[in-house]
Amino acid sequence: MSFRIATRKSKLALVQTDYVIDLLALKFKMQCEKVLIRTEGDRKLDVSLDKIGGKGVFVKDIEKALIEKRAQAAVHSMKDMPNELLDLFEIIAMPVREDVRDVFISPEGIKFLDLPKGAVIGTSSIRRAVQIKNLRHDIEIVPIRGNIETRVRKMKEEKLDGIVLAAAGVKRLGMSEIITEYFNPFEFIPAVGQGAIGVEILKNSEYASTLGKIDNEDIRMGVEAERSFLKKLQGDCHTPVGAYSVIEGEILNITGIFQVGNKLIKKDVCGDKWDYIALGESLGEKIISG
């Protein structure tokens, strides 16, 4: 019997799952099959995420497949994962992290700072909206949901001046040519876990030892530092919060943003990468204290 991996049905989710499947085939000669799940977040594209339960809407139906033994593992975008998992589950591996940056896509190829006054940009991310406004107070923000292809289509149909997306998704779909420009990740802070793929299993799974061998330690430490920062702030998809971690040698640097009232606070900390959880918490405390 083949090893079953639960995943969303979107083209991007399938590309990410195929990456894990290829890795398992290469390292362990495992035969895998995909179990396709249409999540609540995929079904309710006309409703904002904060109204249907936040990030968990992309995860709960997939985790149900693990509980019901329809799949032995699941592949997720780490930025979609709730800050705290149920005790039943664990992220056993984070094998890869693509480009963490956000990108601006303009149908006319106009760069962000060159847009006309009052230009209209589509995003349903509060984090992106706040940072767009921080850079250009005159920009009008309109909500836009759906997969990458859908959002690009809506941008053209609704005659928007542009949209902001995650570079990782655009690149994984082989659509880099539509990118007008990349935002500097130190100036336009990405979402927690952006670009990282996570493999989730039930705790005490018989496959834990094998799947753990595809984990990338530095990627995990960086993402977990960002997640501990988010947890300290009790942030979620309703909150303008972002974090960006970089590991150089044994040093981890993490930069975070959080909006308090109308003020966008940005801080950073650095230290020994093995203290990644404490570093994330320290950054949260630093931002809370102003």
UniProtKB/Swiss-Prot annotation:
Question: Part of which pathway?
Answer: Porphyrin-containing compound metabolism; protoporphyrin-IX biosynthesis; coproporphyrinogen-III from 5-aminolevulinate: step 2/4
Residues with PTM S-(dipyrrolylmethanemethyl)cysteine? 237
- Family of this protein: Belongs to the HMBS family.
List the HAMAP family hit by this protein, alphabetically.
Answer: Porphobil_deam
What biological-process terms (Gene Ontology) are attached?
protoporphyrinogen IX biosynthetic process
Q: What is this protein called?
A: Porphobilinogen deaminase
Q: Which UniProt keywords apply?
A: Porphyrin biosynthesis, Transferase
Q: Which EC numbers characterise this protein's activity in its record?
A: 2.5.1.61
- Organism, as annotated: Clostridium kluyveri (strain NBRC 12016)
Q: Which reaction does it catalyse?
A: 4 porphobilinogen + H2O = hydroxymethylbilane + 4 NH4(+)
Q: Share any extra remarks.
A: The porphobilinogen subunits are added to the dipyrromethane group.
